[in-house]
Amino acid sequence: MHFFSVSDRRYCFDEVTRNCFQVDQASEDALRIFEASGRTVNSKLLTKSLAAKGYDQTTIAELEDDIDEYQRLSERTFLTKDTPRKLRSIELHVSHACNLGCSYCFAGKGDYGTSPLLMTDEIAFKAVDYLVASSSENETLAIVFFGGEPMINEPLIWKTVDYSKRIYPNRNFTYSITTNGTLLNDTAVNSFKEHGFSVLISLDGTGCKHDASRPYKTGGGSFSDIDKNVRRFSESFPFGARATLTNNNCNLVEDYLQFKEMGFRRIYFSPVSSFDENIKLDEHSLNKIRAGLIDLADQYLKQIDQGEKPLFRTLKTAVDLIMSNRIAFVGCGAGRRF
């Protein structure tokens, strides 16, 4: 069990039952005793432990009834074996090249430490063949285009989409791409619409904060071009923003409001993976991020209550798991179904 506070409210998340609920101090004390016993605490031990904490007999009797009911609930909850299933999605690195020189790029500024390379038609088509051959017959399959900057090899993207639909007309495919947003054009956006693409644009905050981390390799900032492209096309296409949080860029609410104003329909935040002292997240940055997450979580829940589709999506997977009472056996599907 995990106990935590939000504002002046106290909560318990039980990883066994996948329930999250508000608790008072007495309930928390009783649940901690229950958990510490291996969820096998008897009435005598519970009474003794609660009495030692100063609770009266009436309160103890109520807590005993609550724990007895919760114990029965826990016993009915089984962690089923996570049986590996067949492949469902594949990520195509269509370009090991990039026009940006991001300071912390895990891909070595796009080329992964080698000479810039573009994927060939043959490799892309073989990858689609492999995906189909390794999948369940009736399952929708996902093709993800990645890089480097995948739009540098834009012709291959459309060839791959055409190949998947033409060679496998009885299979359903979804398509997605993560791009830096600098190379968007009318033809590409129209094709995104036609084929139902999900498009994420990588950003590092807005304005000078973004430009400090994500300049062009030729020099100069890239944010103004991205901003122009998003505003131009967002009225007709639902772009998503994926913002990287660094030590110099950790004001979630400020960036969220700016991304919303630009026209993004989905907004995600992810922490930087770097040991660079100039950008890695320190305790001060993490505290700012926690505060921002709480503010955005409140907005997220308000939008759900009002029947709206939330823009802030960072917490969506976790909230969906809790609301559906499901459990994720692994944090990432790479090497399993992906």
What is the predicted function of each stretch?
Residues A124-V144, N153-S274:
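Radical SAM/AdoMet-radical enzyme domain recognition
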Residues H2-Q22, S49-E91:
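N-terminal [4Fe-4S]-dependent radical SAM core
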Residues M1-D29, R313-F338:
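Accessory C-terminal segments flanking Radical SAM cores
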Residues D111, L117-L118, A212-G220, E283-H284:
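Short glycine-enriched, charge-decorated loop/helix-capping segments at active-site entrances
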Residues G38-A51:
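Short acidic, hydrophobic short linear motifs in intrinsically disordered regions
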Residues G147-G148:
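Active-site neighborhood of divalent metal-dependent phosphoester/pyrophosphate hydrolases
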Residues N278-F338:
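A C-terminal junction/extension of Radical SAM enzymes
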Residues P84-R85, S89-E122:
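Canonical Radical SAM [4Fe-4S] cluster-binding loop centered on the CxxxCxxC motif
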